[in-house]
UniProtKB/Swiss-Prot annotation:
GO molecular function, one term: quinone binding
Family: Belongs to the complex I 23 kDa subunit family.
Listed name of the protein: NADH-quinone oxidoreductase subunit I 2
Catalytic reactions on record: a quinone + NADH + 5 H(+)(in) = a quinol + NAD(+) + 4 H(+)(out)
Keyword Iron appears in the UniProt entry: yes
UniProt subcellular location: Cell inner membrane
The species this protein was found in: Solibacter usitatus (strain Ellin6076)
A single cellular component GO annotation: plasma membrane
């Protein structure tokens, strides 16, 4: 009879809820207001890639050495270049970076001799399509554009 009353009045449920609420102190509960307030990320966080440009002339710093593509364990960086007739240097033609396969290890950033490739602290890289995750040279130079929400 006692077991039946315990099942009817949900005694076990209330005992479990008591244990849960006893260990939750409301003054320690913290909720981030994410879209309105951007969270602070760690200083060494590696996020969205960016191709740096020279502020003096607006050209990319990439010298098309292909070391970043060779250092990448996922083979997601594709660099193509052509030799210039005038300067006799390799000039960057295309640079693609597949962020959907990237594990953000930073080996490509370390391999770059001129610091042209950088992993920034931007973390908003969501896309509705797989093609949106493959960034070309223009997207890498501009960097991700975080959505500004108004509350």
């Amino acid at each position: 009879m006692i077991e039946l009353l315990k099942k009817i009045f949900l005694v076990d449920l209330f005992q479990g809820l008591f244990v849960t609420f006893r260990n939750q102190n409301p003054k320690y509960i913290y909720t981030e207001q994410y879209p309105a307030e951007r969270p602070k990320v760690a200083e060494r966080y590696r996020g969205a890639p960016r191709l740096n440009i020279n502020p003096d002339n607006g050209e990319t710093l990439c010298i098309s050495c292909n070391l970043c593509a060779l250092a990448c364990p996922e083979n997601l960086i594709v660099v193509t270049s052509e030799r210039s007739e005038v300067t006799k240097r390799k000039e960057l033609v295309t640079f693609t970076y597949d962020t959907s396969r990237c594990m953000f290890c930073g080996l490509c950033e370390d391999a770059c001799p001129v610091d042209a490739l950088e992993l920034t602290q931007d973390f908003e890289m969501a896309s509705y399509t797989r093609e949106g995750q493959i960034w070309d040279r223009q997207a890498l130079e501009e960097g991700p554009r975080p959505t500004q929400y108004k509350c």
